[in-house]
């Protein structure tokens, strides 16, 4: 066996070696990484390898299977490995700092990689990152009633638990004052149409208000995102001192469990089907729908309660609708009424994770699609699996960013 094949075999064995962490990308956790930084001594996925190529003074990459590896380089990889290198470069990652996963957008991955290896922010002797009390700067914000993005000044007052923004630099007062306890932030790059697009949501007069913002700098928008997360963690820590930090971190911000177009009819099931953009919020157990993906407010929402409370998801369309061009669909039944939905387009049918979700008050919704709807659409199971406890006794109403009393997200336990 030649050196090339022998060293390739050694590398493939290293990928599966127990106690090394090499079986997953050192940066995003993707399984079965096929690339490696032979200057850092880590195994990474194809997507993250593209980021590493941008700073060759710090990291140099090779394909594990396709490139030639000499003996000394393989020895270096053997001596290091993912867990050992992560212990060095991730020694002091703040609890609020978002660590991206394989499914996250590229700007989060890129800034995480640069923060670790280029700026060395999380090393033991690195610069201390603390949750700043205040942050101020300009972001491009989409107008509420049009598609134009305008430059707006945002001010975060973390200690006061407020985020404000101004339409004029020298305005008399803020256009909006947002309470951190009601705020969520999630990157929505494809929906916004910008690689740095961030969606900020908060409660306003019983509705969910959406702000769509971006910044030209990837570092700046990710810094804003983590500043909001730091403020959220400060709020959660003060509001729920009995809970350990490890249980609060998953509640800081959240991504939608699923988003996409479907068509729905009304509670009488005689109304025409209308195409709507749906967003499934597992943490608040709500299915929101919009006329357009970038609307400032939802058109309506359905709370997904438990089956014991009278909520149900039926994997079919009512008889009066079945037999038209829509061959299958979903009906969401609530104690008050029912609604019918049909999914759009065909390729999304298998991806709506309905099973974990069903909770408080809503209506019946019906969805359909000619290709049929498999079991993976059942919302009740997905939500019920995650929400099996109640809010702490002293708190009522929309605590922790909006859970009603009697319902709480995964991780919170009954404290009474």
Predicted regions, residues:
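Polybasic, Ser/Thr-rich intrinsically disordered tails and inter-domain linkers
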Residues: 3, 115-131, 140-147, 169, ...
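Canonical RING-type zinc finger of E3 ubiquitin-protein ligases
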Residues: 30-40
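Surface-exposed beta-strand-to-loop junctions
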Residues: 2-6, 27, 66-70, 86-96, ...
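Disordered regulatory linkers adjacent to lipid/PI-binding modules
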Residues: 132-134, 233-284, 295, 303, ...
């Amino acid at each position: 066996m030649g050196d090339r094949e022998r060293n390739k075999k050694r590398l493939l064995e290293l990928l599966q070696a127990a106690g090394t962490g090499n079986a997953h990308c050192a940066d995003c956790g993707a399984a079965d990484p096929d690339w490696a930084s032979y200057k850092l001594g880590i195994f990474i996925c194809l997507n993250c390898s593209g980021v590493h190529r941008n700073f060759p003074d710090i990291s140099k990459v090779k394909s594990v299977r396709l490139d030639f590896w000499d003996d000394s380089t393989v020895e270096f990889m053997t001596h290091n490995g993912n867990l050992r290198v992560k212990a060095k470069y991730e020694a002091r990652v703040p609890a609020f700092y978002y660590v991206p996963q394989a499914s996250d957008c590229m700007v989060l991955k890129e800034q995480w990689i640069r923060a670790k290896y280029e700026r060395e922010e999380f090393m033991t002797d690195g610069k201390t990152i603390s949750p700043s009390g205040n942050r101020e700067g300009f972001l491009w914000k989409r107008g509420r009633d049009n598609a134009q993005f305008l430059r707006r000044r945002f001010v975060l007052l973390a200690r006061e638990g407020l985020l404000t923004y101004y339409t004029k630099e020298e305005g008399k007062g803020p256009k909006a004052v947002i309470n951190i306890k009601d705020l969520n932030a999630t990157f929505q790059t494809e929906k916004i149409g910008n690689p740095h697009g961030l969606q900020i949501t908060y409660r306003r007069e019983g509705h969910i208000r959406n702000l769509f913002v971006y910044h030209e700098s990837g570092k700046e928008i990710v810094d804003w995102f983590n500043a909001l997360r730091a403020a959220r963690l400060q709020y959660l820590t003060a509001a729920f001192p009995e809970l350990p930090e490890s249980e609060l971190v998953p509640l800081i911000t959240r991504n939608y469990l699923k988003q996409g177009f479907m068509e729905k009819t009304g509670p009488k099931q005689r109304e025409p089907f209308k195409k709507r953009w749906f967003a499934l919020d597992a943490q608040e157990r709500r299915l929101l729908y919009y006329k357009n993906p970038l609307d400032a407010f939802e058109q309506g929402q359905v709370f997904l309660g438990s089956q014991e409370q009278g909520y149900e998801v039926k994997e079919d369309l009512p008889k009066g609708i079945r037999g038209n061009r829509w061959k299958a669909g979903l009906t969401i039944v609530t104690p008050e009424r029912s609604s019918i939905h049909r999914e759009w387009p065909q390729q999304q049918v298998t991806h709506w994770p309905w099973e974990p979700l069903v909770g408080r008050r809503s209506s019946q919704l019906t969805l359909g699609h000619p290709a049929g709807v498999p079991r993976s659409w059942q919302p009740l199971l997905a939500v019920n699996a995650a929400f099996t406890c109640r809010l702490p006794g002293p708190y009522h109403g929309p605590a922790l960013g909006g859970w009603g009393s009697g319902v709480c997200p995964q991780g919170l336990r009954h404290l009474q």
